[in-house]
Amino acid sequence: MLRSILVALCLWLRLALGVRGAPCEAVRIPMCRHMPWNITRMPNHLHHSTQENAILAIEQYEELVDVNCSSVLRFFLCAMYAPICTLEFLHDPIKPCKSVCQRARDDCEPLMKMYNHSWPESLACDELPVYDRGVCISPEAIVTDLPEDVKWIDITPDMMVQERSFDADCKRLSPDRCKCKKVKPTLATYLSKNYSYVIHAKIKAVQRSGCNEVTTVVDVKEIFKSLSPIPRTQVPLITNSSCQCPHILPHQDVLIMCYEWRSRMMLLENCLVEKWRDQLSRRSIQWEERLQEQQRTIQDKKQIASRTSRTSRSNPPKSKGRPPAPKPASPKKNIKARSAPKKSNLKKSAS
């Protein structure tokens, strides 16, 4: 079984970025506060833009949930009204499985019909994904009895981060043993590294979330470059190593240049972290312009080479060898010439 959807796809709830600038937020819907997940995002699957709107809409099902007509009804409703917020599925939040919807509907619709109600169209099961063919969640995919070594730390009112206690091997990993290479903030470095994001941020917290993972929480102030939307709020930067390189300390105001990987913002050894200076930020903007110019030049050269290659294939060069040899004379004339003397000999003998 997978460990809390925490989850069907090893998705960790500590990640709290948002879509189009909207961060994940703590679940505030009373009916859903005891679900195995504790952060959600809006709009939900029913297009409610705020949790306040979702609360008003979900209240109509409270009596149905209270009579316990189905063991999965509450789970299904919360998966629709307060979907799980995970970094890997920001643009298309995970839906409940079709089988969960069908179980809730089949269990509760007979009772609803007794009061002249039918299963609502807005909760139709037909469009929901099937477990074997798509990404979806069901109660069976979630372990609710988490091990004792797992606890939740509230970093901000709107973000939860999971932390595990370390085993003996992890405790022996001292930061003093790590030797980080200094990356110099130069144009040559910027052009060669081709970073995917550049931000101005303040370091809020640095914490080890496993033997080979360090999470650095930063408060994003300015965004100079990014491949995907970065919210101006607190976001986690992931270091997938036992060493945190480059070294940074909490409460520093810094300029960070690094990479995104599978929608995660990474903080890796070959990335650049410098104390914030206006002059350096202006340089980074100029470096990005040079990088774009360099990439356009490379692209233009590739297009020219491609066109030249296509032209040479369609119009092959003519051969410059020796001229062709002349054709031999027709053999018929030679045959006639040879046969002429034979006729004259026949005439002489006849005479």
Curated annotation (Swiss-Prot):
InterPro entries: Frizzled/SFRP, Frizzled_dom, Frizzled_dom_sf, Netrin_domain, Netrin_module_non-TIMP, TIMP-like_OB-fold
Residue stretches making up the NTR domain: 178-306
Mutant phenotype after disruption: Mice laking Sfrp4 have increased trabecular bone, reduced cortical-bone thickness, and failure of bone modeling during growth, resulting in wider bones with thinner and mechanically inadequate cortexes.
Any one Gene Ontology cellular component term annotated for this protein: cell surface
Tissue specificity of this protein: Expressed in the ovary. Localized to granulosa cells of periovulatory follicles and corpora lutea. Weakly expressed in adult tissues including kidney, brain and lung.
Bias kind Basic residues: ranges: 333-351
Role noted for this protein: Soluble frizzled-related proteins (sFRPS) function as modulators of Wnt signaling through direct interaction with Wnts. They have a role in regulating cell growth and differentiation in specific cell types. SFRP4 plays a role in bone morphogenesis. May also act as a regulator of adult uterine morphology and function. May also increase apoptosis during ovulation possibly through modulation of FZ1/FZ4/WNT4 signaling. Has phosphaturic effects by specifically inhibiting sodium-dependent phosphate uptake.
Domain notes: The FZ domain is involved in binding with Wnt ligands.
Protein name: Secreted frizzled-related sequence protein 4
Record organism: Mus musculus
